[in-house]
Amino acid sequence: MRILVDADACPGKHMIEKAASENNVEVIMYCDINHRLESSYSEIKYVESGFQSVDMVIVNEVKKGDIVISQDYGLAALVLGKGAYAINPKGYIYDNDNIDRLLFERHMSGKIRRSGGKTFNPRKRMEEDDKRLYENLIFLIGKAKK
């Protein structure tokens, strides 16, 4: 079991590494070549820049039981289909019970924006998001290790 991170725009990396190091779990952070990441714990993998390039590499490398951290519902749906776990950087767990609704809401929001309407932006990251990410990541690590 590993933690794979869609790290291009992923807040909370310090909490991910904290939870992983406490549980001796490998972390691989994926980003495109236009970003620079540094970590003394995680392996950093750079991929070519391009639309969905990081997502496609993660989908190709994920294995059953891995944990994927991403804000992207589409990526979450794909890795859930491969038997992996998925969580977003604010600590919300994606699962087979909520992913269809999230994808539908994303689709509807896109339609509203394309027709000139307005949708709500996500709220700013708060300390409680780091706490939720850490706690739910610990939960998923325990679940994946069973």
From Swiss-Prot:
InterPro entries: UPF0178
Source domain of life: Bacteria
Pfam families: DUF188
S-S pairs: none
Family under the similarity heading: Belongs to the UPF0178 family.
NCBIfam families the UniProt entry points to: PRK00124.1 (NF001095)
Classification via PANTHER family: UPF0178 PROTEIN YAII
UniProt name for this protein: UPF0178 protein CTC_02403
Organism: Clostridium tetani (strain Massachusetts / E88)
